[in-house]
């Protein structure tokens, strides 16, 4: 890990999606390095976070193995990856902001993906003083 700082530590998520062989839909595989969990929005259900055992941030212990996770995704499911700048606010616990983001995602899940992401960016629960990045994908309908 090459760094331009004296504290070379960062968080991230590595994920891939592939067609599911056992049932209709897709399979999400992911591993985190201390990053916030992805947000899953399945049609007709409230948004939920994919809480799973996190790995340590990059730069902490490169020899430590990272846990891998897997989840079935039905057709038309949205997965949202985001930086902490979307939810961190100095005046409230991050769990409260995560709940607010999940509620927002549930309320606007039926929007086309680009509009959905724009709503999350425009109405984020953070104070707006940190970097903000959102990556969302929606599985195709079968």
Place the predicted regions along the sequence by residue.
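Active-site-proximal, acidic helix/loop segment immediately C-terminal to a metal-coordinating Asp/Glu
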Residues: 49, 54, 62, 67, ...
């Amino acid at each position: 890990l090459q760094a331009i700082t004296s504290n070379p530590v960062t968080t991230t998520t590595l994920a891939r999606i592939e067609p599911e062989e056992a049932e209709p839909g897709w399979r999400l595989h992911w591993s985190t390095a201390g990053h916030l969990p992805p947000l899953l929005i399945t049609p007709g259900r409230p948004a939920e976070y994919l809480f799973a055992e996190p790995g340590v941030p990059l730069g902490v212990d490169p020899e430590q193995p990272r846990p891998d996770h897997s989840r079935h995704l039905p057709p038309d499911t949205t997965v949202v990856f985001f930086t902490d700048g979307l939810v961190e606010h100095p005046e409230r616990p991050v769990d409260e902001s995560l709940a607010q983001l999940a509620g927002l995602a549930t309320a606007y899940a039926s929007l086309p993906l680009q509009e959905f992401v724009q709503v999350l960016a425009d109405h984020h629960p953070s104070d707006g003083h940190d970097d903000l990045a959102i990556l969302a994908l929606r599985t195709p309908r079968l």
